[in-house]
């Protein structure tokens, strides 16, 4: 008798997510902007309304990914700070402590796959818009989509790299240095 297959952590099944509502909203915003761009003019005859709705969905996707989904699904967050005195701008990356928080393999897989696939789809649509030469307005909308999606992709990639580097560094050096310092200080205090 065949046994039903059990879903394994890491599969692309939203039911395995540690945060299913966050994941569904994340995927919903990611796909809705693309779908509105592709099929909006078929259902809504007003070009300006389709343009504005697509732009609003892109903005919602950017905000939700940057401020909510990244933090809840993979424990990463980023923002840009500007020094008001000098006008210099720099990115700040934050990651959750791997010792206190476990990231669901399913959430992680959905997050990174969607993060890299979405800009690739928008690049394909940009090439299509250039080849068709139908309207510069459509190309401008794709350019806005590319700026927003690539910004999040680059920022989260850097944030993940920063997170991995600090985790490896703390594992390699943290335990030994802290133990040596604490042992040396306590040894001196109680001699």
Swiss-Prot record:
Pfam families: DUF846. The chain crosses the membrane at residues 16-36, 38-58, 110-130, 136-156. One of its GO terms (cellular component) is Golgi membrane. Its main location: Golgi. It is a multi-pass membrane protein. InterPro entries: TVP23-like. GO terms for biological process: protein secretion; vesicle-mediated transport. It is found in: Golgi apparatus membrane. Keywords: Golgi apparatus, Membrane, Transmembrane, Transmembrane helix. Belongs to the TVP23 family. Golgi membrane protein involved in vesicular trafficking. This is Golgi apparatus membrane protein tvp23. The gene is tvp23.
């Amino acid at each position: 008798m065949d046994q039903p297959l059990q879903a394994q952590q890491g599969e692309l099944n939203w039911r395995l997510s540690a945060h299913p509502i966050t994941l569904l909203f994340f995927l919903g915003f990611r796909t809705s902007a693309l779908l509105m761009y592709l099929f909006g003019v078929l259902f809504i005859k007003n070009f300006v309304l389709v343009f504005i709705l697509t732009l609003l969905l892109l903005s919602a996707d950017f905000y939700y990914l940057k401020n909510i989904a990244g933090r809840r699904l993979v424990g990463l967050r980023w923002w840009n700070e500007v020094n008001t005195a000098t006008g210099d701008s720099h990115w700040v990356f934050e990651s959750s402590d791997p010792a206190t928080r476990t990231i669901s393999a399913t959430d992680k897989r959905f997050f990174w796959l969607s993060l890299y696939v979405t800009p690739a789809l928008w690049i394909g649509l940009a090439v299509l818009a250039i080849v068709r030469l139908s309207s510069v307005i459509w190309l401008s909308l794709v350019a806005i989509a590319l700026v927003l999606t690539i910004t999040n992709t680059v920022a989260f990639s850097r944030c993940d790299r920063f997170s991995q580097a600090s985790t490896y560094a703390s594992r390699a050096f943290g335990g030994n240095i802290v133990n040596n310092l604490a042992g040396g200080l306590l040894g001196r205090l109680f001699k």
